[in-house]
């Protein structure tokens, strides 16, 4: 099955799995999804992820979700930039999520990174989604 928006698909799979208190969820593999998951892992929102190759040649990403006292670590995850309405931000205009308690994930010329990394690298880009 093809999706027109792989980032929204990834976010929805994570959100749905956490609502059902699943420990793992899988998603079709791609470099962009792996880079997004690397940012979420580095920021402490997921335990980790692994790439699983199938005999048919397709790969999947197996995501280990993270919980604290039985509650999901990710309270809220929202798509900002969509295929029909792209949202770009310069370094000066990067959004702060809940006064810095959450993060924005951006696609920049230097790769996919969290908002604080983009400020340090002095780059702006497309605001993919926010996590709190």
UniProtKB/Swiss-Prot annotation:
PROSITE patterns in the cross-refs: RIBOSOMAL_S8
MF annotations from Gene Ontology: rRNA binding; structural constituent of ribosome
Entry annotated with the keyword RNA-binding: yes
Keywords: Ribonucleoprotein, Ribosomal protein, RNA-binding, rRNA-binding
GO cellular component, one term: ribosome
Homology family: Belongs to the universal ribosomal protein uS8 family.
Known function: One of the primary rRNA binding proteins, it binds directly to 16S rRNA central domain where it helps coordinate assembly of the platform of the 30S subunit.
Protein name: Small ribosomal subunit protein uS8
Source organism: Rhodopseudomonas palustris (strain BisB18)
